[in-house]
UniProtKB/Swiss-Prot annotation:
Mg(2+) binds at D74, D93. It comes from the Bacteria. Its cofactor is Mg(2+). It holds the Pfam family TMP-TENI. This is Thiamine-phosphate synthase.
Length: 216
């Protein structure tokens, strides 16, 4: 049985070595957790497998002590090696159904850019969706065209599993994203590249929480 519906998805922080301004993943995530990060995704596209395992183990130690789920992007082998809480796969990564067979009951997130991809991910066994990009983003140069708040609403109307919105989300638009139906926001540069990571995370967490409370 999936634990996705009891996970606090409000502030999902994704690592990015290229944006962290020379700070280690550990330093950035430690500060983000202090600021209120509720989920952490380890995303590393350029390191060796050995380095990824070493870095993910460090994050696993941090997140476990904080009670925050650790998700590994794409690499099922790394997630299993460090006993992460889950894996997140994109449309060009390992097929969702195969990832599910390999990871068992761990959390499985899937990126979706439109309703068709979202519905297929649900059928294949996704626990949650990473929907976007909502807005234009410079974090992923190869990102698809933004789907906007209307695209997010359309997916929300047809799926019941948790949705984490991603892509160009920051302090100026986080509340709008939550009002459009997201269960949480996934952020990269808005936290990882901030001068004060803890303060940036705290501000975003507060915005998301207030918006959720008003919706109840």
């Amino acid at each position: 049985m999936s634990i996705a519906h009891i996970v606090d998805w409000r502030l999902y922080v994704v690592t990015d070595a290229g944006l962290s301004r020379g700070r280690s993943h550990r330093a950035v995530i430690e500060a983000a957790i202090v600021g209120g990060a509720t989920v952490v995704q380890y995303r590393e596209k350029h390191a060796s497998t050995r380095q990824m395992i070493e870095e993910a183990l460090e994050l696993r130690d941090l997140t476990r002590r904080a009670g925050v789920p650790l998700i590994v992007n794409d690499r099922v082998d790394v997630a299993l090696a460090v006993d992460a809480d889950g894996v997140h796969v994109g449309q060009d990564d390992m097929p969702v159904a195969l990832a599910r067979r390999l990871i068992g009951n761990k959390l499985l997130g899937v990126s979706a850019h439109n309703l068709s991809e979202a519905l297929q991910a649900v059928r294949d066994g996704a626990d949650y969706l990473g929907v976007g990009p909502i807005f234009a983003t410079t974090t992923k140069p190869d990102a698809a065209a933004p789907i906007g708040l209307d695209g997010l609403r359309a997916i929300r109307q047809h799926v019941s599993i948790p949705i984490v919105a991603i892509g160009g989300i920051n302090q100026a638009n986080a509340a709008d994203v939550m009002r459009a139906g997201a269960d949480g926001i996934a952020v990269v540069s808005a936290v990882v590249a901030a001068d004060d990571v803890t303060a940036a995370a705290r501000q975003l967490r507060a915005l998301v929480s207030v918006t959720q409370e008003k919706a109840l």
